[in-house]
Regions:
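Acidic, low-complexity, intrinsically disordered interaction modules
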Residues: 41, 67-73, 81, 85-117
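Selected N-terminal structured segments and early membrane-anchoring regions
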Residues: 1-3, 20, 63-67, 90
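Zn2+-dependent metallopeptidase catalytic core
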Residues: 4-24
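Active-site scaffold of zinc-dependent metalloenzymes
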Residues: 23-70, 78-85
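Long, low-complexity, intrinsically disordered N-terminal extensions of eukaryotic proteins, enriched
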Residues: 1, 27-31, 103
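Metalloprotease/metallohydrolase-associated module, dominated by Zn2+-dependent proteases
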Residues: 95-161
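N-terminal low-structure segments adjacent to metalloprotease catalytic domains
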Residues: 1-4, 82-84, 130, 135
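A structural signal for well-ordered alpha-helical segments within the folded catalytic domains
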Residues: 68-72, 76, 123-127
């Protein structure tokens, strides 16, 4: 991955926020969680709608949370790390197997989304994210107020907008 001008500033802002959860964030090719070492990956170069379009599910479940799509995606990944201890190793393996089945099934997008979001680890990661943003709107707003200009600056400095 090429080095982007301004990404260090974004990393610093995000990690100053995620530190409260014991989570480290790093720029990556997609949004993902590595719960074993409490790390989340985030991207700024593509759509964060992710597998199963959790953003549509999240905003349907939390219509009162008016967060940017980037925040939803980031907080969802943090939510995976924060809820990881709810599951046994066998349950986590089962969830992965179920997601493999979902992704390979020949079903419509609505059915896939419903099935995907019914996976307990996905459901509770989104629940954690929505509950946190609902219960801490000032903290999340302050974070976004710092982060959004840094993201826009990075896009400009790299000729992306």
């Amino acid at each position: 991955m090429a080095k982007l001008k301004g990404i260090k500033k974004i990393d610093k802002i995000i990690n100053n926020f995620t530190r409260q959860f014991g989570v480290i964030a790093r720029f990556d090719t997609e949004f993902e969680a590595f719960c074993d070492d409490m790390t989340v990956g985030y991207t700024l170069l593509g759509s964060p709608t992710g597998t199963g379009d959790f953003i549509a599910d999240a905003t349907k479940r939390y219509p009162d949370v008016t967060a940017d799509i980037f925040l939803w995606a980031l907080m969802h990944e943090i939510g995976h790390c924060m809820t990881e201890n709810m599951w046994t190793e066998e349950e986590r393996e089962y969830f992965w197997d179920q997601k493999d089945v979902i992704m390979s099934a020949e079903i419509g997008i609505e059915e896939m989304n419903a099935w995907y979001h019914a996976c307990p680890d996905e459901f509770f990661a989104t629940k954690w994210a929505g509950d946190y943003m609902r219960n801490h709107p000032k903290k999340v707003g302050k974070f976004w107020k710092k982060l959004q200009p840094a993201i826009l600056d990075m896009y400009k400095r790299n000729g992306l907008i």
